[in-house]
């Protein structure tokens, strides 16, 4: 099995920790004035989604996680499972609500997603970085009303709620960054 040394740690690297695959979120190399250097690492467990911090001595070796990231097209949700299709061999995979998690609000039919598999089972779904969704509900923007923060909440077709500028109206399609949940622009 492949392994990584602490000097190879980077954000996004997937390693095994206590028999569970984890992804490195942050890696900080610390060299104190006295004593041995070490890496302070923030990890996200891929199965449970929990975030934890761990320190590794400089030069330690850690086993690489045997996970696969594959690009799939999101097809539909049947109420219990979200179905995805591999465009190369047309094989379909289903992921349950625990795997999809909060990313369900960003899944649009025919969107290219990344599915993370461990032992052949899906453990995480990553939606595209940007999605285009229609606004189904928002307050009407009053002309000249910019004394506040300049934003209002808007509900999208998937049920997600995003803060949008005052000039955006119901029925318009907007571009949203799925990593932060922020409004990016209107789609013409």
Swiss-Prot record:
Report the principal subcellular site.
cytoplasm
In the record, N6-(3,6-diaminohexanoyl)-5-hydroxylysine modifications are located at 34
Q: Entry's InterPro entries?
A: Elong-fact-P_C, NA-bd_OB-fold, Rib_uL2_dom2, Transl_elong_fac_P/YeiP, Transl_elong_KOW-like, Transl_elong_P/YeiP_cen, Transl_elong_P/YeiP_CS, Transl_elongation_fac_P
* GO CC annotation, single: cytoplasm
Q: In which pathway does it act?
A: Protein biosynthesis; polypeptide chain elongation
Q: MF terms per GO, please? A: translation elongation factor activity
Record note on modification = May be beta-lysylated on the epsilon-amino group of Lys-34 by the combined action of EpmA and EpmB, and then hydroxylated on the C5 position of the same residue by EpmC (if this protein is present). Lysylation is critical for the stimulatory effect of EF-P on peptide-bond formation. The lysylation moiety may extend toward the peptidyltransferase center and stabilize the terminal 3-CCA end of the tRNA. Hydroxylation of the C5 position on Lys-34 may allow additional potential stabilizing hydrogen-bond interactions with the P-tRNA.
Going by the entry's taxonomy, the superkingdom of the source organism is recorded as Bacteria
Q: What does this protein do, in the record's words?
A: Involved in peptide bond synthesis. Alleviates ribosome stalling that occurs when 3 or more consecutive Pro residues or the sequence PPG is present in a protein, possibly by augmenting the peptidyl transferase activity of the ribosome. Modification of Lys-34 is required for alleviation.
Q: Which HAMAP family match?
A: EF_P (MF_00141)
Protein name as catalogued: Elongation factor P
Q: What is the lineage of its organism?
A: Bacteria, Pseudomonadati, Pseudomonadota, Gammaproteobacteria, Enterobacterales
Protein encoded by which gene:
efp
